[in-house]
Curated annotation (Swiss-Prot):
Name under which the protein is recorded: Translation initiation factor IF-2
G4, as annotated region: 669-672
Keywords carried by this UniProt record: Cytoplasm, GTP-binding, Initiation factor, Nucleotide-binding, Protein biosynthesis
Region (G5): 705-707
Sequence segments annotated as region (G2): 590-594
GO molecular function, one term: GTPase activity
Length: 1059
């Protein structure tokens, strides 16, 4: 004590009490203290001494009882919980109950549906076993009543005989209480839980014995008895003490989850079973809808409830447990004895209720077996209460399902099915014919249903398999196919194709593409005929520009003329001559040549008509459109030099024009030269199907001179005459569609595309889609460099506003909204990415980066002297490993390297390979100007080595370790900053800032960078073998004599192709 202050722990020692006892006394006396080390005044200590002397010295002297008492005064919740725990310990009657039940129906009591009790529903659990649950204010009275009644009064004797006359009296004891019994507290009796269904063979024995099977209907009389008990004891209780929660629990009976399934038959038999206790049921009707709760466990092993499955009610003669719980608050009015016990004597009501789909397939039950049990007797009645029937459907429990049911209990409830989806009723004849025998039991039903289900399932699988594996009569091979696509076409497994190719020495996987010869080899083994269609030219027009909706608004449009021909035959000179003669008069500065299409006004029959020329030669657009170039044109002009004759490029142009089915006008140029021989040119053209008109054919041939400007008007007049015959029309009122002539990325204006409108009218602000690119037209510029607001059919304009650069030759179309355009471009981009991944020239595996678009590619253009050399080189290229670099063969053919090949290589960044061939005139200059790599070979091995080296050059170099030398630690010196190793260079050399490893007894103790290297106190860059040096590291000082320092460096090395 100091200055009249006393500490709590000193006072506890003085009084021989614990600190918590003193704190409890302080709390009772309202003395403010915080802990056992708090100080109080001497007067307060004296008061505590006086109070503590009157209290017993025991650990019970604490603040907890006082605190609980005060809490009980405020609310009865805590006291009720303590009371519930004490009552739940009364378990003496249970062995007697179990013994009596096992004596009468030991085989029936194995599959009780229970769920584990929890603390949140202890009130309901007490009610389930018939133990009264008093209020908090009736603790002493309830204990007293329980002691008076005794333990045996809580048990209902199961072997007491049951007859129909006294069933109601026995089961509804609380209803029959006399006036003399009202003075006493009614003690509800413990009711035996319901038993599982029994086989029909036991039904007769159970009827004869008359065993009383209590069910859940006994709860309602007990509940009423509870209410009366509360009324009788109301003068002794305080209304404020009873909590809302307890009142709710005492007034509302909650059925168990299991009863929801087991009471199905009771619900269905409600109309058929009428009892004379209607007034009793009206008294027992609960005020609120009952909520599900949980049964109390028996001491036996609990049998968990199965999850409802897709099933129908049991057969007519099968037994069931009737718990007698009416969710609507009604009681049966006729035969109570049969309702309370097993419903054995009356046949069950035949119902057709919608089945409940289940989330798991633990037990297979045949649909047909279920439908045999369905009848049409009650389908109309159940239509009004379909939801009730769905909830109360009963599923029998099988004895071998104990372990599986535990897993099913915690799963979510199944989704109910609408009654409109249920199958209609079967005819009575069909139902009676398939009626099960009374002697059939659950095991037979399960066995039969399983067999039926397996047979139906196997039959359906066979039908599906036969439908999927239907062989094809003839296979059309148009291009390479993957193994998966070929297997689907042949209706055989993919593994079979992989196995067959593996036996032939070809290793493939399911995603690899097979070339046509390999596909033919596989198909021939199947005995299926093969059809290889002729290769369709890409120049053929596959899409119609005009549609049916355009026929009502067609107008004439200018012709689109494409100039084609061999290199240096005067195509560009002819176009320049036409521009100079017809445009210079109207436009003082001439025509801008920055786009590939332009229009010329031509006078024909006294009227000015417009002709649109497409300047394809020398353009990147023409290179991208080479195979499709003829599709955009209406009239093709073939330029042939009179002094050179027909050349390979001329023949190619003729084939494009025929594939596109466009009229062809031949312009024989350079007739002003001395070496010109137009007749020889006509003769050569006849060999390719072009017969001049003067020789009796239909081919129009006009001799012209671009330099002398001879017969240019005749050529233009012929173009207009041919266009009139073709009757070229379009609908300018519709949304525009056409073709991309060329496209490029401008530094100032962004993506720029030259569009040729073939139908409709293109306007500023339109949403256009070109291939996999879309955008909004911000501005349009015509061939003269002027801005225009709209472009009519056969008009070529430059368009600004696209989000990306489209591919030359792509078709464009205008859409009404941007959302639709974005969806289409996304779909096309995905398809384009997939086609690029699947486009392969070898059988190498597709790497992961190929699927993600990160695969490196090497583009090749192959030209050879003969076709046999080309085939040999292509076969050799397929053998190169292509897991990391994909080899793309863009073009292969026999002949010389032309300027067109140079343009294609420049556009696609390809390498041109020439094998025993030459370069055409002008091709080498074009290659130098475009920066195209042209390789020429005459030995195939050298060619393959160089291609493999080029593929390896695309790979990222790998880092390898290169050793520098070894150093031995011979002395260790300690300095202020740490330790320095005195070393001797054994071999090689050691370099400052190189990577090192320190080994001690063969184990690595440190890895890092050599920070400091000195020789004779001088910093040096390197020390060679045979010299001493000092070595130190910033973060390593644990040196030991004899350590070996390995110095090395990382260098890059060219990677090899992995097989």
């Amino acid at each position: 004590m100091n200055n009249g202050k006393v500490r709590i722990y000193e006072l506890s020692k003085e009084l021989n009490l614990e600190n918590k006892d003193i704190l409890a006394v302080c709390q009772r006396l309202n003395i403010s203290v915080k802990s056992h080390s708090s100080t109080i005044t001497e007067s307060e200590a004296e008061l505590i001494r006086t109070t503590a002397e009157n209290l017993p010295h025991s650990p019970s002297l604490s603040a907890a009882p006082e605190k609980s008492n005060s809490q009980n005064q405020d609310s009865g919740i805590g006291y009720n919980e303590q009371k519930k725990q004490q009552i739940l310990e009364v378990r003496k009657p249970k062995p007697l109950l179990e013994k009596s039940q096992q004596k009468n129906h030991s085989k029936i009591n194995n599959n009780l549906v229970t769920t584990p009790p929890n603390t949140s529903v202890l009130n309901n659990q007490v009610e389930r076993v018939g133990i009264s649950r008093p209020n908090s204010s009736l603790k002493s009275e309830t204990l007293k009543d329980n002691s008076e009644v005794g333990d045996n009064s809580l048990v209902q004797h199961p072997n007491r005989p049951l007859n129909k006359d006294n069933t109601v009296k026995e089961n509804y004891v609380p209803q029959k209480t006399d006036s003399n019994e009202k003075s006493k507290v009614e003690v509800p009796k413990l009711v035996a839980p319901p038993a599982r269904p029994a086989p029909p063979s036991l039904n007769r024995n159970l009827r004869n014995t008359g065993v009383n099977k209590p069910n859940q209907k006994n709860k309602k009389p007990k509940q009423e008895g509870k209410k009366r008990k509360d009324k009788e004891e109301k003068p002794f209780e305080k209304p404020a003490i009873v909590s809302k929660k307890e009142n709710k629990d005492t007034s509302i009976e909650k059925p168990t989850i299991a009863s929801k399934k087991e009471n199905k038959d009771t619900f269905q038999n409600r109309e058929s079973v009428k009892t004379s206790a209607s007034d009793t049921s009206s008294q027992l009707k609960p005020k609120h809808r009952e909520k599900p709760t949980v049964k109390l466990k028996q001491e036996q092993k609990p049998q968990l409830a199965p999850k409802p499955k897709l099933t129908t009610p049991l057969k007519e003669e099968s037994t069931d447990v009737n718990l007698g719980l009416d969710l609507e608050g009604k009681e049966p009015e006729d035969n109570v004895a049969e309702t309370v016990s097993y419903d054995l004597e009356k046949p069950r009501r035949k119902t057709i209720a919608p089945s409940k789909p289940t989330l798991t397939k633990d037990k297979k039950v045949s649909k047909w077996e279920e439908e045999e049990e369905d009848t049409s007797e009650v389908i109309q009645k159940n239509a009004k209460s379909s939801a009730k029937n769905k909830r109360l459907r009963l599923k029998p429990l099988l004895e071998d399902e104990d372990e599986e049911l535990a897993e099913l209990l915690n799963k979510p409830a199944p989704v109910t099915m609408s009654l409109s989806l249920a199958r209609p009723a079967k005819p009575k004849s069909f139902t009676e014919k398939n009626k099960p025998q009374p002697g059939s039991n659950i095991s037979n039903l399960k066995k039969k249903s399983s067999q039926s289900h397996e047979s139906v399932q196997s039959e359906s699988n066979e039908q599906t398999q036969s439908a999927e594996l239907k062989p094809v009569e003839k296979l059309v091979i148009s291009a390479s196919m993957t193994v998966q696509e070929l297997a689907l076409a042949l209706a055989i497994p993919e593994t079979e194709i992989i196995r067959r190719l593996f036996m032939k020495g070809i290793a493939v996987n399911i995603t690899e593409s097979l070339d046509i010869p390999t596909i033919e080899m596989v198909v021939k083994e199947e005995g299926i005929p093969i059809e290889v269609p002729e290769e369709q030219s890409a120049a053929k027009k596959t899409t119609e520009i005009l549609e049916e909706t355009d026929l009502a608004s067609l107008q004439r449009r200018p012709p689109v003329v494409t100039i084609m021909g061999h290199v240096d035959h005067g195509k560009t000179s002819l176009l320049d001559s036409i521009r100079a003669t017809k445009v210079a008069a109207g436009e003082a500065g001439g025509i801008t040549q920055h786009i590939g299409a332009y229009h010329v006004d031509v006078e024909h029959e006294g009227q000015m008509q417009q002709v649109v020329f497409l300047d394809t030669p020398g353009h990147e657009a023409f290179t991208a459109m080479r195979a499709r170039g003829a599709r955009v044109t209406d009239v093709a002009v073939l330029v042939v030099a009179a002094d050179d004759g027909v050349q390979p490029q001329t023949i190619e142009a003729i084939s494009h024009a025929k594939a596109a089915e466009v009229p062809l006008i031949v312009a024989i140029n350079k007739i002003d030269k001395e070496e010109a021989n137009p007749d020889r040119v006509k003769q050569e053209l006849m060999e390719h199907g072009l017969v001049p008109e003067e020789w009796g054919g239909d081919a129009i041939m006009v001799p012209v001179s671009a330099i002398q400007k001879q017969n240019l008007d005749t050529l233009l007049e012929m173009i207009l005459l041919v266009s009139e015959v073709e009757d070229l029309q379009a609908n300018p009122e519709r949304l525009a569609k056409g073709t991309v002539i060329e496209a490029n990325l401008d530094k100032a204006r962004g993506p720029v595309a030259t569009l040729l409108v073939q139908n409709g009218t293109l306007k500023v602000g339109d949403i256009i889609v070109a291939g996999s690119v879309y955008g909004k037209v911000r501005a349009m510029i015509d061939d003269r460099g002027y801005r225009v607001d709209k472009a009519s059919p056969s008009f070529a304009v430059e368009v600004l506003g696209l989000r990306d650069v489209p591919q030359a030759g792509d078709e464009f179309k205008v859409f009404k909204n941007e959302k639709e355009a974005s969806a289409i471009t996304t779909e096309r981009a995905d398809a384009k990415r997939e086609s690029r991944i699947m486009r392969r020239t070898s059988l190498g595996a597709v790497s992961v980066r190929a699927q993600e678009g990160e695969l490196k590619e090497l583009n090749l253009i192959l030209k050879g002297d003969v076709q046999g050399s080309i085939e040999a080189i292509v076969a050799a290229l397929r053998q190169l490993p292509q897991k990391e670099v994909q080899l793309r063969l863009l073009l292969s053919g026999a002949g010389e390297v032309t300027e067109t090949d140079i343009d294609l290589a420049a556009a696609s960044e390809a390498v041109i390979i020439g094998f025993n061939t030459t370069m055409a005139s002008g091709a080498r200059q074009a290659a130098d100007a475009a920066g195209v790599d042209v390789r020429e070979y005459n030995v195939i091995y050298k060619l393959l080595d160089d291609i493999q080296g080029a593929m390896e050059g695309l790979l990222d170099p790998e880092l390898i370790e290169e050793p520098l030398g070894q150093v031995e630690v011979r002395a260790v010196f300690t300095i202020n900053r740490g330790a320095v190793a005195g070393c001797y260079v054994l071999s090689g050399k050691v370099v400052r800032n190189c990577k090192v490893r320190v080994r001690r007894n063969g184990e690595i103790v440190y890895q890092g960078i050599l920070d400091s290297l000195r020789r004779m106190k001088d910093d040096v860059k390197e020390v060679n073998a045979g010299y001493e040096c000092g070595v130190s590291f910033d973060n390593f000082n644990n040196w030991s004599e004899g350590d070996i320092i390995e110095a090395y460096q990382m260098v890059t090395k060219r990677r090899k192709l992995s097989t």
